[in-house]
From Swiss-Prot:
Glycans are attached at residues 254, 392. Its main location: secreted. It is found in: Secreted, Extracellular space, Extracellular matrix. One of its GO terms (biological process) is positive regulation of cell population proliferation. GO terms for cellular component: extracellular matrix; extracellular region; membrane. InterPro entries: Glyco_hydro_79, Glycoside_hydrolase_SF. This is Inactive heparanase-2. It comes from Mus musculus. Belongs to the glycosyl hydrolase 79 family. PANTHER family: HEPARANASE, INACTIVE HEPARANASE-2. Residues 1-38 form the signal peptide. Keywords: Extracellular matrix, Glycoprotein, Secreted, Signal.
Length: 592
């Protein structure tokens, strides 16, 4: 713009300027001031780093939730846990009485605790009481002279306790155990890579320790029996299982049961295949063993715990459902996302990977509903990476994107229970490490347990979708799920709603609550990595505060950050969080 009235450098006094010129200048300055104020009023946000980022941040996502009726209702124990029988091999079973481990497990109750895995079908029960004489593997001399004696002394001390048997293991004892487990970890990995497994002995003492851990932690034990003990005609040999059933019944242990683990792999690991109809007959045989035992006459039975539903696996499931579909209380299968030997940190952010589970769910549901419509389906033994996991990846913050999306997707598609492999174990897929410290997925699971109820709600968004280019599929990098808030959480009244959101974008996203959620108070629980490692961090922060245990018997308080009513939710890039929308008075959430 040119100003037609200009002044010389040696300006005269204002009184000497022509009146028409002064008016024109005044009008021009007023116009500039008005434009400046308008600009600043409408742009109170950080300046974009580049043009692309600026365009993304202008997209405001409107979010509403259907509050009249839930679309699904899952099990109260929806998020459950698994322990692998390898803890017998590496010695960690003897430390399940640890006060710290029990505290961590109790934080995730109520839940099922499945005792099963790849070594299920190599497990034999022996009714022995002396753990020192029955433990496999000689080990170094100091293990035999000191370590084993310490275990025996610890067991004697525990036997004197009434009720829950809790131990405080000395640091030296734990350090020796970590050395032993580290050596055994190499043996276990070799077995897994070669697909050849050695036999395991479960003693009565070990079963007592396992049940004590589950009972003290508020977990319901599901025990997977060995299905590979076969008679010459390929029928199941139940002698070892019957011995275990009689012992646990004599102790009045409240246990549910399974038979076998990934039966589709039996030919490769045992040289003898078991088809679906034979496995169905084996389950009927197990049911007939349980019914005469008063303690287990009404015990739940789950199976067949198949692997990824490829063509041959679907055929096995089909044969099983024809014969024993009505025998089991829920149909179970397993899922692994990535090969742990080749995984990279960016793999955990790939939406294509997050979506692989959805197709498997539909395949399983199709077979189950053909024979037993409405039968509950469980995903057991879900892991992010195979081969025991990958250090600094499957035990890091990055793995949480897969885990949280798995929880949201399974509930949305009607899967009743998901069992996480593993709560505590060798390798790097666990929730708790071998120093008994909770890893990022533990804190994520704890938040889920505290805030998420079993009722699933439908989410409606606007401003999120865009038209794909020809030949391309748009996969959401912003994932939003909604449930009724956990009614056991006394910080929130019935009728509140909890959102959990995954932002895989490299830019922040803004979400405006609309409809029934509009102008409601919100509590934010934003979970981010803590420390210099970023996505590879094994520590997390909640709303900027690092999460650590207070002591061996106390979990930290999970403090929310209150957001004022009507405030836009801002989701930072590559993060996840929970948002409790208070006092919605949602009809779907007011009653159990």
């Amino acid at each position: 713009m040119r100003v037609l009235c200009a002044f010389p450098e040696a300006m005269a006094s204002s009184s000497s300027r022509p009146p028409s010129c002064l008016a024109l200048v005044a009008l021009f300055l007023a116009l500039l001031l008005h434009l400046s104020l308008s600009f600043h009023a409408g742009n109170r946000r950080p300046l974009p780093v580049d043009r692309a980022t600026g365009l993304k941040e202008k997209t405001l996502i409107l979010l509403d939730v259907s509050t009249k009726n839930p679309v699904r209702t899952v099990n109260e124990n929806f998020l459950s846990l698994q322990l692998d029988p390898s803890i017998i091999h590496d010695g960690w079973l003897d430390f399940l009485s640890s006060k710290r481990l029990v505290t961590l497990a109790r934080g995730l109750s109520p839940a099922f605790l499945r005792f099963g895995g790849k070594r299920t079908d190599f497990l034999q029960f022996q009714n022995l009481r002396n753990p020192a004489k029955s433990r496999g593997g000689p080990g170094p001399d100091y293990y035999l002279k000191n370590y084993e004696d310490d275990i025996v002394r610890s067991d004697v001390a525990l036997d004197k306790q009434k009720g829950c048997k809790i131990a405080q293991h000395p640091d030296v004892m734990l350090e020796l155990q970590r050395e032993k487990a580290s050596q055994m970890h190499l043996v276990l990995l070799k077995e897994q890579y070669s697909n050849t497994y050695s036999n395991l002995i479960l003693t009565a003492r070990s079963l007592d320790k396992l049940y004590n851990f589950a009972d003290c932690s508020g977990l319901h034990l599901i025990f997977a029996l060995n299905a590979l003990r076969r008679n010459p005609n390929n029928s199941w040999n139940s002698s070892s299982a019957l011995s275990l059933l009689k012992y646990s019944a004599s102790k009045k242990y409240n246990i549910s049961w399974e038979l076998g683990n990934e039966p589709n792999n039996y030919r490769s690991i045992h040289g003898r295949a078991v088809n679906g109809s034979q496995l169905g007959k084996d389950y009927i045989q197990l049911k007939s063993l349980l019914q005469p035992i008063r303690v287990y006459s009404r015990a739940s039975l789950y199976g067949p715990n198949i692997g990824r539903p490829r063509k041959n696996v679907i055929a096995l499931l089909d044969g099983f459902m024809k014969v024993a579909g009505s025998t089991v209380d829920a149909v179970t299968w397993q899922h692994c996302y990535i090969d742990g030997r080749v995984v990279k940190v960016m793999d955990f952010l790939k939406t294509r990977l997050l979506d692989t589970l959805s197709d498997q769910i539909r395949k399983i549901q199709k077979v189950v509903n053909t024979y037993t419509p409405g039968k509950k389906i469980w995903l057991e033994g879900v892991v992010t990476t195979s081969a025991g996991g990958t250090n600094n990846l499957s035990d890091s913050y990055a793995a949480g994107f897969l885990w949280l999306n798995t929880l949201g997707m399974l509930a949305n598609q009607g899967i009743d229970v998901v069992i996480r492999h593993s709560f505590f174990d060798h390798g790097y897929n666990h929730l708790v490490d071998q120093n008994f410290n909770p890893l990022p997925d533990y804190w994520l699971s704890l938040l889920y347990k505290r805030l998420i109820g079993p009722k699933v709600l439908a989410v409606h968004v606007a401003g999120l979708q865009r038209k794909p280019r020809p030949g391309r599929v748009i996969r959401d990098k912003l994932r939003i799920y909604a449930h009724c808030t956990n009614h056991h959480n006394h910080n929130y009244v019935r009728g509140s709603i909890t959102l959990f959101i995954i932002n895989l974008h490299r830019s922040r996203k803004k979400i405006k609550l609309a409809g029934t959620l509009r102008d409601k108070l919100v509590h934010q629980y934003l979970l981010q990595p803590y420390g210099q490692e970023g996505l590879k961090s094994k520590s997390v922060q909640l709303n900027g505060q690092p999460l650590v245990m207070v002591d061996d018997g106390t979990l930290p308080e999970l403090k929310p950050r209150p957001l004022r009513a009507g405030r836009t939710l801002v989701i930072p890039p590559v993060t996840m969080g929970f948002y409790v929308v208070k006092n919605v008075n949602a009809l779907a959430c007011r009653y159990r």
